[in-house]
């Protein structure tokens, strides 16, 4: 019996670790773990704001295999910044994510939430509309748009 414990708040690393462990046991190749994007960018957000984060993020293009730059990683980073009241930095991260993953309703929803937190109503409406177009069955998005006075 193998027991895997994890203290990462999202919990899915246990599943990934379990799959990787099984692959190793069966002689299959395993991808190397990538570094957490937030560990790199949050200190820059705190010390240099959006310009420092942007420069580091753009530099990652050549080193993307070292850092997890997935849609989920960017969204998680954006919400971490939002919870830290670093709204301009969160908006920048969500914008990068929307640019990299334009077909994701979740990304546009998150960007709308950040704009809304910043009092940018029109931008929030635009983002929520885009999210609603991509996920037309999402009643929550329709409710938010109605709340914002747009339908």
Question: Where would I find each of the regions flagged by the language model?
Answer:
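Catalytic loop of the DD-peptidase/beta-lactamase superfamily, centered on the K-T-G motif
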Residues: 1-58, 75
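TPR alpha-solenoid repeat register
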Residues: 73, 107, 140-141
